[in-house]
């Protein structure tokens, strides 16, 4: 009798282990999200630029200048892990509407402005957290929804995001002015 039970019990245990492994694999960890960010940095070919309206003269939009995209990606590689980093207190507006930069990849130039082209994931959103003199990095989950619950905080950069926005805006101004 015990031999007859051994096979079904073994099979049940194997199925449960497989299901548990699948569930664990689906839960993003800070390490897997950082890996997604690195993949996004490696494949980024454009940046959706939304300058700080008070401190920028440049129109928002898509920037495909390779050197500019490269500079942003190089800086973002300095990300610090998100341990101990929290969503900004009192955040009421959607992160999507407050992001200064969005890394884009896999787009044709005419597709860059589509509002729902989220299939090219992951997308990295960069938010200036001025109250804490830092820049927060988020990865969007790829859904068609852009509520705050659809973003995962993956890390921070330890400098004032506003300063960086202004500096990159000035670089972009000088590039477009020299062309």
Kindly give the residue locations of the regions a language model identified.
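Function-determining sites in protein domains
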Residues: 2-179
């Amino acid at each position: 009798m015990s031999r007859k039970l051994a096979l079904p019990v073994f099979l049940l245990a194997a199925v449960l282990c497989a299901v548990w492994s699948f569930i664990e694999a689906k839960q993003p960890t800070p390490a897997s999200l950082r890996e997604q960010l690195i993949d996004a940095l490696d494949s980024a070919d454009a940046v959706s630029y939304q300058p700080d309206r008070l401190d920028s003269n440049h129109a928002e939009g898509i920037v495909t200048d390779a050197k500019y995209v490269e500079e942003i990606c190089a800086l973002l590689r300095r990300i610090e892990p998100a341990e101990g980093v929290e969503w900004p207190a009192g955040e009421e507006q959607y992160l999507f509407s407050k992001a200064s930069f969005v890394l884009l990849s896999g787009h044709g130039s005419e597709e860059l402005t589509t509002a729902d082209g989220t299939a090219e994931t992951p997308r990295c959103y960069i938010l200036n957290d001025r109250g804490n003199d830092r820049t927060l990095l988020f990865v969007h989950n790829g859904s068609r929804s852009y509520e705050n619950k659809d973003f995962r905080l993956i890390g921070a950069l330890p400098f004032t995001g506003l300063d960086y926005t202004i500096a990159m805006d000035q670089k972009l101004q000088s590039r477009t002015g020299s062309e």
